[in-house]
Each structure stands twice: as structure tokens, then as C-alpha cells.
Design a protein with these regions (language model features):
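Conserved N-terminal subdomain of the carbohydrate kinase-like
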Residues: 1-68, 248-251
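Short, hinge-like loop/turn segments at secondary-structure boundaries
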Residues: 4-8, 31-34, 111-115, 143-145, ...
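Short glycine/serine/threonine/alanine-rich loop segments
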Residues: 11, 92, 237
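Glycine-rich phosphate/pyrophosphate-binding beta-alpha loops
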Residues: 23-24, 68-72, 228, 234-237
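Short gly/ser/thr-rich secondary-structure transition/capping motifs
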Residues: 43-51, 104-110, 138, 209-210
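Acidic, amphipathic alpha-helical patches
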Residues: 53-54, 115, 144, 183
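Conserved beta-alpha-beta core of the PfkB/ribokinase-like small-molecule kinase fold
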Residues: 69-147, 154-155, 162-165
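Conserved phosphate-binding/catalytic region of the ribokinase-like
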Residues: 85-86, 137-251
Length: 251
């Protein structure tokens, strides 16, 4: 199914490997406000080892993006860190979404240890205001984003739900308001936001952050907020995500 979705959307999946184990399943429950709770049945992604990684592909990409779900299991952790280090060493922009799912971790301390480990390799990070205290030991947006910047993260984006997105770039901070939305389901909103940001950064050339000014970054985040709002207005995850034409038409 996932390979079919990639094909239908014109995504190159030449690096995709098929394992004997089943695909991990996420069982998502949605309450009356559109907020979610998760249960997981883990599968093939937990078995990925460094030898499975196409290092040349990672080092020749414009952007490498990963999330913290692949840091929850031993061998997959090794593969994830190996790939991020290879890309970082080659000068590839490394993007990180430390999406905290308590059900996937033994303890919060374990999550903190492994979710913060890749930060020195990361150029761009997207996290929620709920995840900020876990990674930085403060809920203050200015101070928390400053602590991430001190660890080497160039662009920090903190999603605030209906309050929009807080950003730190080159020592400057600003907030982009959210679009008013009748929320059906928030599932996939963060992934849509990050995908939209990376799409716009990728269009900037071989060095996506080079020469990026605050005004352009603000416009990129407006675009991403709009994309996420469209996802929230629909039920589901992948089926709820808008096309590029839909986002541009809604701005």
C-alpha cells in the first residue's frame, strides 16, 4: 500500500527495501476536538541496520529528514544515527522531527537521552510546544529555541496548534499565526507542515538555507501553516494531506 501511494504521487522509491516482517501499524483514536491518542504494532522498521543504508544516496541528497520514531529501537537507532552522520559530514541539510510518542519508549528518561543525541547533526528541527520541555527542560519558547540553537540547530520551528508557529533563525524570532480552521482530525498535520517547509526549502537550490532571509522564511511558514490547516479540516492521515495546487489555491 505505501509503495503504491508513493508511486501515485510521483515519489522516487528506488531506495525502498522490502522486508519479510510486516509494516508497523499505528492505531489512532481521535476525540471530539480532533486530538489524537496512539497505539502501535511495531514491524520491519525496527529491524533496519546501518548496512541497509544507501550511504551514497544520503550524501548526495539536498535534504535528509528523519524522525525520532526510528530511535526507539536498538538496531534502528544505529541505522538512523549512521545515516544522519553521513549526510551531515557531506554537507547535506539534515532535518529532524522529534515526535514524542510515549507508548514507544520504555521511560521518559530513555526518550530524552535518544531524542537529544542527534541534535548536533541537525540543521532544521520541527517540534511541538509539548515536546519543547522534553528536549530543552523549559517550556519558554525563546529560551527553549535558544538552547536548541546553541546545540547547532540553525532553524527552529515550534508548532503551537491553533496559535500558529514560533520560529528562530539566525538569532531572530517571530510567530506566524495559524489559519482559522474547523478541525476534523489533527492526524498528519505536523507531517504536512514539515513536508511543506522542506518542499519550499528544496526549491531554493543545492544549499537550501544559504541566503535565506527572514521575510522569505516567514512566507515559507505561512505556506506550511496553510497546508497543515487543510489537513486538519479532513479526516485521516495521508488521504487528508492536500496537493500543492490545493495549498496554493487556498492562499
Amino acid at each position: 500500500y505505501l509503495r503504491q501511494v508513493l508511486e501515485e504521487n510521483g515519489v522516487d522509491h528506488s531506495g525502498l527495501q522490502i522486508a519479510d516482517s510486516p509494516t508497523t501499524m499505528a492505531i489512532v483514536s481521535v476525540d471530539g476536538t480532533g486530538e489524537r491518542s496512539f497505539r502501535f504494532i511495531r514491524g520491519a522498521d525496527c529491524e533496519m541496520v546501518p548496512e541497509d543504508v544507501d550511504e551514497a544516496l544520503a550524501q548526495s541528497s539536498k535534504i535528509l529528514h528523519f524522525g525520532s520514531v526510528s530511535l526507539t529501537q536498538g538496531v534502528a537507532r544505529s541505522a538512523t544515527i549512521f545515516t544522519a552522520r553521513a549526510a551531515h559530514k557531506a554537507g547535506v541539510l539534515v532535518s529532524y522531527d522529534p515526535n514524542y510518542r510515549p507508548a514507544l519508549w520504555r521511560t521518559k528518561r530513555d526518550a530524552l537521552e535518544w531524542m537529544t543525541l542527534p541534535l548536533p547533526l541537525v540543521d532544521v528541527i520541527k517540534l511541538s510546544d509539548e515536546e519543547l520541555p522534553l528536549l530543552t527542560e523549559t517550556g519558554d519558547l525563546e529560551e527553549g529555541s535558544r538552547r536548541l540553537e546553541k546545540q547547532g540547530v540553525a532553524l527552529v520551528m515550534i508548532t503551537l496548534g491553533e496559535r500558529g508557529t514560533f520560529c528562530r533563525w539566525r538569532g531572530e524570532t517571530f510567530t506566524v499565526p495559524a489559519f482559522p480552521t474547523r478541525v476534523a482530525d489533527t492526524n498528519g498535520a505536523g507531517d504536512t507542515f514539515m513536508g511543506a517547509v522542506l518542499h519550499r526549502l528544496c526549491r531554493r537550490g543545492e544549499k537550501p538555507l544559504e541566503g535565506l532571509e527572514l521575510a522569505e522564511l516567514r512566507e515559507i511558514v505561512v505556506f506550511a501553516n496553510r497546508a497543515a490547516s487543510l489537513t486538519c479540516s479532513r479526516s485521516g492521515a495521508i488521504p487528508a494531506m492536500p496537493t500543492l495546487a490545493e495549498v496554493e489555491g487556498a492562499l
